[in-house]
Amino acid sequence: MLFLLTGDVQIGKTRWLERLAAELSGDGVQVAGVLAPGVWRVREPHEVPGERGLAGEGRFEKLGIDNVLLPGGERVPFARRRDLALAEGSFDPTSQSASAQLAWEIADEAIARVNAHFDRIAAELAAVPAGAPALPGEAGSRGYA
């Protein structure tokens, strides 16, 4: 099953998903996948959004995006704003994100790490016998929420 959660910037979508995943896990539901929280910093009072490439609105500047691999909780740096990656020297002009001309620098190794995580989940699901419950008391499901 696939759900899409949408909303404005900085309204708490990721925090809500993190709480939901923790609650489901606490109830014995296996939660697997990837959460993608932003990496933010508080703007200085004199900084204006849009000035010097300051991304995001309001009090916070978005610097990057991490991935949290569930169910284990491993946090993987995933994307860095391209202007920051260029300034820091971490931009790779041969990366997939550079080829796609994204506003984010995403290391090919980070993409491979997340893809390997999804491959592992798919393999674990394939090994679950048909009809095995995913949710407590639910028959006919496949082991994950």
Language-model-detected regions and their locations in the chain:
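Hydrophobic anchor at the beta1->P-loop junction of P-loop NTPases
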Residues: L5
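Active-site signature of alpha/beta-hydrolase-fold catalytic machinery across serine-
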Residues: R19
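Hydrophobic positions on the alpha1 helix immediately C-terminal to the Walker A/P-loop
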Residues: W16
